[in-house]
């Protein structure tokens, strides 16, 4: 098993946090039964499951996933580390199967996400793409879902013993830099993700429960950086 996973060179942290040196993805065994079918597709909000749950989880996604390694909890420990995080800046769902973005310590080969998952063999995956697939107000998520579905199928084929949880596209701030990004599209894409999860047997993590202001329909105050898209430390803390 590799000692470290190095993010794509574009995923450069903007701030630093103390990384827990003992954190590691705990491998699932070939007898591990993924996805408890008694749990509803949309996972309900629950109490904090503790650090062991986080350390047993492989987080996959775009620059917001990178931020899980950049911010720390109140003990000074990063929410996730390079050992259980595959976050790539500017990546969308269409690149899951094709983009060679991951390197392992002592190995010069670049791996796609499915190939990296096969090497890490996690017990659980929380995957979040979609922010880089947005643009305009169209509510037609057909292409987005087809790309996501293909990526998830490739991950499942590479390592079929992990529970897969699809994380919602996070809400935007009303005062965002790119006004071509709309909550109309975010909501439509998230609804399509729920349907995909229901049809394909994945679970859906509705992060809007903690990130969205129900009164406005946008992200809660101070939950994004100044661009109105990337999650702030406050938001990541609430997420975890």
Task: State each model region's role.
Residues 128, 167-168:
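Alpha/beta-hydrolase-fold catalytic nucleophile elbow
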Residues 171-240:
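Catalytic His-Asp segment of secreted/periplasmic serine-dependent ester chemistry enzymes
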Residues 1-60, 64-70:
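N-terminal secretory targeting modules
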Residues 51-146:
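Conserved SGNH/GDSL esterase-like catalytic core that processes O-acyl groups on lipids
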Residues 53-56, 120-125, 159-164, 199-203:
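Loop/turn elements at helix/coil->beta-strand transitions in domains of secreted/extracellular proteins
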Residues 141-151, 183-189:
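Charged helix-capping and loop-helix junction motifs
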